[in-house]
Each structure stands twice: as C-alpha cells, then as structure tokens.
Amino acid sequence: MRKISTENELRAEGLTAEQAAAAADTSSTVLCIACAGSGKSQTLAYRIARVISEGTPATAIVAITFTEKAADSIKRRVAKVLVRCGLSANLIGQMYIGTIHAFCQNVLGDSDAIFRQYDVLDDNRFTLYLMSRYPELGINALKPRFKDRYFETLAQVQHAWNVYRDEGLSLKEIESRDPQVGNVLKDIGQRLIRDQFLDFSSMVRETADRARTDASVRARLSRIQHLLVDEYQDVSGSQEELIATIHELGASVFVVGDDDQSIYGFRGARFEYSQLC
C-alpha cells in the first residue's frame, strides 16, 4: 500500500497542487470550491483513499450525492483510486456512497421498523400522489389564487409543502398566517401517514429531527468519522441541519460546492477553504 497522507505524496499520484491540498487537509470542516472540469471527483476519491490508508474503517465513511448517476460515478472513481493505491476495491461495499434520500431511508429504517413499511415518493411520484387526492386535500380552495389553473395550483402547493418540511417551519404559525394553506399542508401530512407514504422532503426532515433527539439515530450517526458532500450549494435547510448534527457527533465534514457566497458554514462551524478552480 502506497502512502498518500501528505500533499507531496498526493502530487506524486498525479493530482494538481490544489487537488492535493484539498485531499490532504485534515481540518474538521473543509469547503472545496470546484468548477466544471476541476477534478472534484478525483479529489473526493483520493481524500477517501487517504483516510482509509491512515486507518479509518471504510464503514465509517459516508459520501453524499444528489443523484444516483453522480453516486455511481464517484463509486467507480473511488474503486479505481483504491486499487491504484494498493487497497481493495471491495472496500466500496463497506462505505456508503449514494444519495442523501437513500441514506436517510436507511437510517430511519434501522431506527424504527415502521419506516420499512412506508413507500418512498420521489418528486414525480409525490406530484402524482397529490393529483390523485386533489379534491380531498382542499387544494381546490386555493385555485382562485392562481387564476383557477390546476397545474399551477398543484405546483405551488407542492412547493409550499417542500419549503415547510425543508425549513422545519411551524404548522401552527403557517395556519395562523394563512389558514387555507395551513389546512392543506396539515391534510397532506395526515394523508401521507395514513397511506404510509414518505416523500423526499419529509424523509430528510424526519431524519434531521431524530438526529437531535433519538438515541438510536444518534448512535448510528456517531459511527461516521468522515462525511463528504457533493454539490453542497444545493442542500436544503433540513439537509444542512443533518450534516451539522453529524459533524457535532464527531465526523469531519468535507463539502464540494460552487463559488456561492452563501456557503460559509453551519451552526457555528466555519469552513476551511480549498480552491480547485
């Protein structure tokens, strides 16, 4: 197994100075600014290989992406780098590299058997779910706000639901400000539970909330030593809360994002910066 702990050792693997610096950075929170073609996947792969070569169990590594296609790409890149560094490609099966929604589904299912009975709705299936229950959810009452346009009303209701769940807003406060919208959101929540469906926004919100209060969820998350997140500029409020809690439980956090000035840190933790482009 070749040593790949230092920047010079990583440079010898063919990484640029910027990539090597990011892969070797041992800070507990690192933001890697990356643009197209800057080699972010290569940097992620070598960072994973580095921490494994230094003794981190593969089971303690979680890499979050936002699409299955991106997850597959990173898995292939990591496997190639592991072999190049004299490590086994089979380690891929011991770590988690995948979407944040699948990760949350695994965490919830392990912590509470009831969630294994739920059918997960991606965004498209959630839209179809709302369409199938349009009359009984009181959505018709909102149509006059959107000139009686069915699909625009539906899209706005789904957007309101996602904001409500992503940002952890209070349903009581929404109801006090806008009773019609509040009632629709409350009905959606009750129907989803009754029908044993879990939409993407609710899945992450449930995981983020339980990560703060549920001992079994916290125990599961505390086993993570290194968390890597791709496309960090796109995370929602609930996703950021979950990432922050995992960091508070002891994991280092390495995130890759574009040059977005809104990315500065979370809940008191500020990023060290690496620049790939």
Can you describe what each PLM-predicted range is?
Residues G109, I263-C277:
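Short regulatory helix/loop adjacent to the ATP-binding pocket of P-loop NTPases
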Residues D110-I139:
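A substrate-engagement module of RecA-like helicase motors
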Residues E54-T56, S88-N90, A219-L221, I246-L249:
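Conserved catalytic network of the ASCE P-loop NTPase/AAA+ motor domain
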Residues Y46-R50, E206, T245:
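Active-site signature of alpha/beta-hydrolase-fold catalytic machinery across serine-
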Residues M1-A34, S38, Q42-T43, A60-V62, ...:
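Accessory N-terminal region flanking or inserted into the helicase ATPase core
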